[in-house]
Each structure stands twice: as structure tokens, then as C-alpha cells.
Amino acid sequence: MSVSLQSRPTTIACLLGPTASGKTAAALALAARRPIEIVSVDSALVYRDMDIGTAKPTRDERARVPHHLIDIIDPADSYSAASFRADTLRLIGEIAARGNTPLLAGGTMLYYKALTQGLNDLPGADPALRAELDADAARDGWPALHARLARIDPATAARLAPNDAQRIQRALEVCMLSGQPMSALLAAPRAADDAAAAYRFVPVALEPSDRAVLHARIAQRFDAMLEAGFIDEVERLRRREDLHLGLPSMRCVGYRQAWEYLDGAIDYRTMRDKGIFATRQLCKRQITWLRAMPERIVVDCIARDSTAQALDALERVLDGLAAR
């Protein structure tokens, strides 16, 4: 084998798509054909005890094919894009060493971007500083901290809502630890990183030719979650003293709305409508991310044979037949 062939990157198929686009069906179809292991690209599936609202793969589905990065942390904890990148690169190597094929599947596009493009050199979390900022917010309110951020990093503040506690806290934390605005750090060239250079990530994107059809699916899916006991799931989480709406886990679509309903802040119908609307907004953002990937292979997720089309696209990628 020539040196050029030896150094050719290993192709990794990535099945990406918005909520309710059929990713699970396509991944399981591939698992019926090849010895794959699925690496979840989903920031909600990492949390334990959050099964219904995140549409986590069922026990039967997980028994049919190994899944990774699911149920790995407690809802009181956080999981970063940096952690995802490190874990995924490690898992890809471990899966290949077992003689299986890794398939990345999910819809958290920020994770995918971190994996394929690397990370900016931002300081890590500082628990003591976060506690200090939380205390300031408890006293003055998050809009006051948003105003503080606007004075030192107006570009970041301009894209954040005054009550976006998690992101305001992180932006202030970065500024205070680094001495630079987060917007400036994000705009700086990424540090050289060879960790992912051994791989060629090829995205197969499940996108709707008619968004209204996907919106109808989203409503049906949310109703199915409610019927499956989603409110009870959130109630169990709500009874925990260490969980609150400011945590990343409780920012997952649907959980905040169900929590507000249980608090008596909104009625059941409003909770349902807000949950569906939030899911549609997530879907819109996911599609925007996908369409910014010129290298993606597009499959119409509302076509009658969408699973077969996705399966064919994935197999072509893995067989080296997809255009480079």
C-alpha cells in the first residue's frame, strides 16, 4: 500500500437531522445490514432519568445495536461540546478496534461543529465564580447581569435575551477569567488540532421538502410523549431539591414548559402549545445549521421511502462511493 493510501482519512458517516426526521429508523436499518455502533450527537440524551421528553431510544432499540453517549450524566450536572468531542474521538477508535463501524447520529449541530472544526480556546468553568454570579443574579436579577455583560462584551450581549441565565453567566465567566470578551475569543482562529485529522466526517442530512409535514409530526410526537407519561417524568425531576430551571438539563425542549405547568404558571393547553412551538423553533435552528453544510448529502425526510434513501446514502458513504 502506498504512503498516500495509508494516510488517507477514515470515513465516518454522520446521520444528522432535526427532531422527528427519522434518524432512529435509518440508523436501525443500517444496523440490520452492518455491525455498527451508534454514537449519539444529542445534548439531551446524555441525561439519565430524562427518557420520554428526549425521545430516547427504547430498551429494545438499544439492545439491537450498541448506543453511546446516552445516560452518561445526572441532570444536575453539565456536559460540554468539548467533552462530547473528546468522548466521540475516543469512542470512534474503540469501536473500530472492536471491528465495528461507528455511526454518528443526532441533531445537536453545535456538537457536530465542535467535532469537525475544533474548539475555540475558551477557559473552563470556574465553580466559585459561577456561585458568585448566581448570588449576584439572585440579588439583582439576570437582566442586571445582562446589562453588565453589555458594557464589557456588547456583541455577545446583543444576541442574548436578558433572562438567558446560562449563556449570560458563561459569557461573564469567560470575560472575567480571560480578560477578553467572549466574542473576541470566538472570532479568533482556532488552535491547531490534529485529533480529528485522521477522520473524514461525511454528513447525511435528513431535511424536509415540506416543513409543514415535519411540524405535524412534531405535534403528534409531543402528544405521544404526553400520553406516555411525560408530565410524571418531569414531576419526579421537579421533586429533586438539586434541580431547577436554570440548569442545562431543564433547558431541554419540553421540560421547561412542563415544569411551568406543574408550578401552576400555565395551564395544560398552553404547556402543550408552548412545548410544540419550542420544538418547532429547535427544528428551524437545526435545519439552518444543516443548510450551512455544503458537503452534506441531503435526504428528504418526509418522502415515503426516506428510510431506504437514508440507508442507501449511508452505505454509499461507508463504501467510499459518495462524492468527495
UniProtKB/Swiss-Prot annotation:
Listed EC numbers: 2.5.1.75
InterPro entries linked to this entry: Dimethylallyltransferase, IPT, P-loop_NTPase
Positions of substrate binding: 19-24
The protein's enzyme class: transferase
Keyword terms of this UniProt record: ATP-binding, Magnesium, Nucleotide-binding, Transferase, tRNA processing
Keyword ATP-binding (UniProt): yes
GO molecular function annotation: ATP binding; tRNA dimethylallyltransferase activity
Quaternary structure (record): Monomer.
Family label: Belongs to the IPP transferase family.
Protein name per UniProt: tRNA dimethylallyltransferase
Organism encoding this protein: Burkholderia vietnamiensis (strain G4 / LMG 22486) (Burkholderia cepacia (strain R1808))
Higher taxonomy: Bacteria, Pseudomonadati, Pseudomonadota, Betaproteobacteria, Burkholderiales
Gene: miaA
